[in-house]
């Protein structure tokens, strides 16, 4: 048994203000944030446009045609369509569950009845990962001379740009802490509604969730931008932000609006750093923390390692809630300590990397033309 999320009328302060003016609030917020994104990434956008202009001129001078936009955009359209119709809950329940049920009759260890929702999200995550990664293999078939590392997979210089990860979180986390109190977010997250049942449920779900995010970053910020940058320049970033926003339709309104900024900002970050890894870290940090905060606001963080079949009642339920709260606080203090240590280590690695390159600590890393 868990506590219900607060109704909109019960919210006060900043959270109540956001809920009241939610329909129009994203407009000025998007304008303000996108202006900051423009200030931070305008040089990156200009470099992308200059590179694309030079590459198109070279192709035109040779009398050739760049088939990359055609191949990339058709692949993206096919994959997103297949995922929508065959990677969701409806297809799983109508087609996959009957097959699983027959298999589960012979293999009772599957515990299909107990974990049917988790199996459903396993299908969802699996189809996403497969669809998002598939273009990389196909790309190597169509364009053998292209390096897959140029599709956002380079790790060189990671620590030179790691400070941007902290900068992004400094902007995103305060806003997330506020909107996480919204009823929309409190009832929507986590996707897997049995996450509070046990740590097995919660951690298994988060592992699938994070793996899906890594594949998503490969697809949108790696494959899409790497394939289209030489033809579209910075326009590839803004073109990518459209379908990226659309895959958020059905999620809370503020999140769907925020996906516009996130798509542009994370895409620009990927183009600046030549990798998807900082964007992935931002994405999973926010997503994992959002799940945790939603459970915390409902007083529904997991307590038991494995699911239990007996629900406590009366005083036993109150005692379990006290244990649940105490465990959650202990985990948060431990996580805060680990994060602080990792932050210090990251700062040390950044300073060492910059000194090794003979860069000043307060300037942006030099970027190649």
What is each residue range found by the language model?
Residues 149-152, 188:
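Short, hydrophobic secondary-structure boundary micro-motifs
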Residues 237-241, 246-247, 254-337:
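Functionally important transmembrane alpha-helices
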Residues 1-147, 294-369:
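N-terminal, membrane-interfacial amphipathic/helix-forming hydrophobic leader that caps
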Residues 77-85, 170-179, 241-249, 284-296:
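Aromatic-anchored segments of alpha-helical transmembrane domains
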Residues 25-26, 67-75, 123, 127, ...:
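Alpha-helical transmembrane segments of integral membrane proteins
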Residues 124-143, 156-185, 191-249:
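Function-critical hydrophobic alpha-helical transmembrane segments in multi-pass membrane proteins
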Residues 57-63, 152-157, 225-230, 274:
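Membrane-interface helix-boundary motifs at transmembrane edges
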Residues 148, 221, 225, 263-267:
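Interfacial helix-capping/hinge residues at the ends of transmembrane alpha-helices
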